[in-house]
Amino acid sequence: MDFDERITASNMYLPSCTYYVSGADFSGLPHYLTQNQSTCPMTYPYQSTALPQVPSVRDVAFRDYGIDTSNKWHHSRGSLSHCYTEDIVHRDGWTSPTPRGGEILVKGSSSGGGGGGGGHPGSSNHTPGFYGSVGRNGVLPQAFDQFFDTAYGSSEGSATPTAHAADADRQAAKTSPASAQAGSDSAESFSPKSSSGHSEEKQSRGSGGQRARKKRCPYTKYQIRELEREFFFSVYINKEKRLQLSRMLNLTDRQVKIWFQNRRMKEKKLNRDRLQYFTANPLL
């Protein structure tokens, strides 16, 4: 080929080739943007029949993600009809397509979940046509209903034991104040705090605990001071001195007698503690 020959604008220069190819040779092939799978077949080293049916890339890439498909992208929804709300509406016989399909799903799921313990989003209070064709949960196809059956079945089975446990807790809460009061009464009856406590304890034991326990009568500071002074002079008190103290302190003879008994027990315990202390520390 001579150098003086001019190349037309339709010719193509291939860097890996040493000759020019005329554009007229490619006139039989359509433009690559207008090609589809039928006009441009391709051979694969593997069997294409063994692969499942996969939707085209354009069908998946330009789904209803904020793109107006009516006037821009002309793609087929045949294989993905279960993904579009308006297709489901037309298929189930609804009057008109609504853009609030997402709100319907959300409201349906919230009202179904807020029902009873065994309720689920596919209950009877929703539109039967929509959820019956889509699935029990209102989003996934019907093939996934078996998983929701297992989940909701376990929750319904566990609802009855939970109710029984709640009833048992209520019964225990009702009975606990009475048992606590009875326990406190028994603990007070066995605590040797004062002389009146000992006397009333014996009375309650004799009557079998049917009669209510009397209220404690604490001694005043003046009464305790006079009783301690008398105990300092004589650990054991005779009957005459006991009657005199009872009249002076406005106490009964029994109260004075039991107070001296308790005071002697307390003194014995203090002496025992002192003995142990000095025995453990002989240098003191």
UniProtKB/Swiss-Prot annotation:
Coiled coil: none annotated. Its main location: nucleus. The keyword ATP-binding does not apply. Residues 110-121 have a biased composition (Gly residues). Residues 174-197 have a biased composition (Polar residues). The keyword Chloroplast does not apply. Residues 212-271 bind DNA. SUPFAM superfamilies: Homeodomain-like (SSF46689). Keywords: Developmental protein, DNA-binding, Homeobox, Nucleus, Transcription, Transcription regulation. Disulfide bonds: none annotated. GO terms for molecular function: DNA-binding transcription factor activity, RNA polymerase II-specific; RNA polymerase II cis-regulatory region sequence-specific DNA binding. Residues 93-134, 155-217 are annotated as: Disordered. One of its GO terms (cellular component) is nucleoplasm. It is found in: Nucleus. Belongs to the Abd-B homeobox family. PANTHER family: HOMEOBOX PROTEIN HOX-A11, HOMEOBOX PROTEIN HOX-A11-RELATED. Sequence-specific transcription factor which is part of a developmental regulatory system that provides cells with specific positional identities on the anterior-posterior axis. This is Homeobox protein Hox-A11b. The gene is hoxa11b.
